[in-house]
């Protein structure tokens, strides 16, 4: 609820919203003795769809006029309820006494209630451009309270109709000269005009007009100026109003300080706003400010503290959505808020986490998560899921797993999304382990999943099997395969292929045959990789007749041997010292229109060179160069060494310079 200001009047008490008094206000008169005899209801003071002011005027024969209005929303749109000219402590209600005779009907001079329709009156003036236009409408209206003009001017301002607002003031200035100063624009009229003209660069002109009319600005005027400069982007000029008010002998009030904080908000200067508040709090503690008895400063400071927390949150959110990386600023402001004793709410912490969407934001998200866990008893599950996603995006998978572990240990209970997010991170980690052959890491990840109640799926087991195969860890591959079956997962062709490869690299050819036969028995169709592995197994056993049968079987199933398949055979022959057989398979792959690559030539050249066939190795090297292949230095050195050892004559110029290891493609 808003604080209420209670001001004494001659006829009672004025009760109104402290923060929304001068403009967009709600107030009423409380009379301890008499009742209200005259009541005039002024409906809407503005006619646009974007604004609404409900207004009342209470009139009695012995009482002054009290104007009230109530808006649909705060002009600043701030949750703090700060109006840009929302307070006037020196409001002198009843400065212009309304004659009840003027409001009475012609029925025998009896005084009756008269309804003044401000909305209709303002609507009739909407096209006014000069004082003459206003006079044409108001000449038969008699004397109207100045509050009516204030309401209309504010309404024109909200509807961006500046010409009729200025025309009304010009008409009042004319009336002032005609009435000898009895009727004319006063401070409240000019404050209303100043507010209506904000955003149109007319502030200086209005101030000059006030000076010519001999009207001295008050604190509301300066508060309004501060907002005007802020909306025009003149932030330093807006903050300079604080010093100007003191120079003019006015003490800044809570609205002044709140508006200054809003300026820092518009500047997106969270540190500046926080430093301003800390300095303000120190001055209040020393009683250098807050001595105005018209305010409950203790209550106002509670609101200011809430407001600075809100501003810091908004600024940090703006920093996080910028294209630039402002994470360091966010962390510094969070630490500065801790030092100042300003702590955002849990909801604000969580909304900041939602604003963390880029990889570099993970450090901010992690810090905010830590603060929520330490300072609050609860945290939103959706926020935790977002953090798990963010950590994965930033490749901080272990940090994501820690958050998941917190959900299991501290709550809230993870849901299906939590599970899927963590499993997806394990997929990435296991895939990396598979590609790099980091088999121990893969096994560790599987154990971690099981420890946290996450059942590894088929693709997870396969990833670790492939990692074991690449690392030539035959024993580990066998254990993983068995564990996969024991956990109820049915092996796929990838599973069998990885196991076959591991067995082949461990030269466990008989075991490989048993696995192959079992795969066929359970109905798993071999793929190219599995056939290639078995080709390598048969080559290692030198069972070339079975190898021919295997290749025919591949052809019958529409699976064409690839360069990798022939390389596996040639490589197996080379390891067993069968360079002649390797050379035959080289010609066979050519006859089957499979083009050899660098690996093919390098393995075959080395096999021939080491098998006392330097001339043939030399010719293959030259052939590879002529085909545009870039061989490494290893076959080059093998050819040169073999030629020297066996006395072969070769042309080193044709071989060219020795390849650099760094230039190996």
Curated annotation (Swiss-Prot):
It is a peripheral membrane protein. GO terms for cellular component: chloroplast stroma; chloroplast thylakoid membrane. Keywords: Chloroplast, Membrane, Plastid, Repeat, RNA-binding, Thylakoid, Transit peptide. Residues 1-68 form a transit peptide. It is found in: Plastid, Chloroplast thylakoid membrane; Plastid, Chloroplast stroma. Required for light-regulated photosystem II (PSII) biogenesis and grana thylakoids formation by binding to the 5' UTR of PSII subunit mRNAs (e.g. psbJ, psbN and psbA) in a light-dependent manner through a redox-based mechanism, and facilitating the association of HCF173 with target mRNAs, which encodes PSII reaction center proteins (e.g. J, N and D1), thus regulating its expression by modulating ribosome loading. Belongs to the PPR family. P subfamily. This is Protein LOW PHOTOSYNTHETIC EFFICIENCY 1, chloroplastic. It comes from Arabidopsis thaliana. The lineage of its organism: Eukaryota, Viridiplantae, Streptophyta, Embryophyta, Tracheophyta.
